[in-house]
């Protein structure tokens, strides 16, 4: 019978599996005890002969044999062979159990579709399922020793009630050398056809449903017969059995304790009893016994299939289904949860145990409170950032408002807040850049040239004049998508040499003393939803804060410079007015106004770079970011 130990291991505890070691039926001890006893007896005999019966010369010869066997014991690949063999046997055993044959579906379909409360309808239902179970009995008689002992002849099958005497006569009329498992199935199909003709089965579809379940049951039994007919090739079990037993026969010599003083392989400790070799014998021999017991699960081992119990279960249950269970559904009434919220009940003891319902691991993560909208944009693809054939085509953008119910009101982790808060951070950076530089509107739906399109004309700053060089080409000292700022040698200096206060756009001048240079401030300057801009924002967000800091430092230094220049000019003006008097005051004022316009401090003539230098490989990977040509 099958040894059931599921209750003993239902709860995992440190001593759970150790309790299984105390069981005898179906255990590893019962499987290997005989072989282990024989091996230990032979080992003891050889040890006694070596220690007492051999002279010194013979002992040296015996010790050399021990050394030879021990050094070459690894030549037998025991782990490899046992691993593959046990895997093949376990897979075969699992499939045989899946198709062993449970007749429940046939009983349910027959009770559902073979209608009628008459005695004739009842006989149709009972005989259809009984014939199917009769076929299973005939199959198990030929493949299971336990079932064969139960039903040694067909007369015993008739006596058990699975076959009627007149049915046995009809069965015996068919005489040929092959098995006749198909006969009961043919009888069952004939009954379904007759029931359809007499109207007991209401439609052809219902007849097909019943017949399909019978066919599935028959197919499973056919596969069981096939597996019994063609087992695993006999060479494989022979090879494994030979390897395991040969290995431990060699161990009888290889694992002997060498006690001679002059021996090179003298054992450090003479334990007399081979402890480690005994453990190895139990493991390897037990491993092989597992495969041996599962090789044919229809035998009489402790853990083989309970074919007789399955036959009893099937015939009892299926007759109950089609007879007493037929058309006896309870009256249709309102359930206890009618118009009420379902609240399952527990026993008082189990109600205190918390449950872990089926729920996504991140289903409780919500948006932070400071996120009010989410901008949905197409995915940026480096390989094809723009739509082929339409490089200026704008992508579809959707802004989704965030409902209060979608926001989190508690702390859900720093990582979530940081990742979702980047939207607000980018918006704040964009506003700072807009205030610092008077550039075109960032959200421009027209298809004109902007910073982000990488088509901005090259610009040049020289003193108080700035040129736009139309048609200039990119070179290695300039970039697009940039912020342009001129500064002095060092913002940390107290005074910066300059001659004018604010840069102005000039026309038509090229070739200044200090050629115009600029650098990248990242694509946050433009938010036109292009693929290049979206990709740069995500990759270069860490550069923004240093750039903003440098811009603010530059503005602060420029403001201090203008204040100092104006203070000096005011002092000079007051001194001159005191010297010349009131008569020439009006003329002096006019001259001073002109002088102030000429001497107004301009931005530093030496360019000041903002941003982080891009690598040469990155410039080549993005053609639209290649630097423009130098001014001539």
Swiss-Prot record:
InterPro entries associated with the record: Bestrophin, Bestrophin-like
GO CC list: chloride channel complex; plasma membrane
Composition-biased stretches (Basic residues): 623-632
Compartment(s): Cell membrane
Chain spans, region Disordered: 491-516, 562-632
Membrane topology: Multi-pass membrane protein
Basic and acidic residues bias spans: 563-602
Molecular functions per Gene Ontology: chloride channel activity
Pfam families on file: Bestrophin
Main location: membrane
TM spans (from-to): 28-48, 83-103, 234-254, 271-291
Keywords for the protein's UniProt record, in alphabetical order: Cell membrane, Chloride, Chloride channel, Ion channel, Ion transport, Membrane, Transmembrane, Transmembrane helix, Transport
Family, as annotated: Belongs to the anion channel-forming bestrophin (TC 1.A.46) family. Calcium-sensitive chloride channel subfamily.
Known function: Forms chloride channels.
Description of how the protein assembles with itself and partners: Forms oligomers.
Protein name per its UniProtKB record: Bestrophin homolog 24
Source organism of this protein record: Caenorhabditis elegans
Gene that produces this protein: best-24
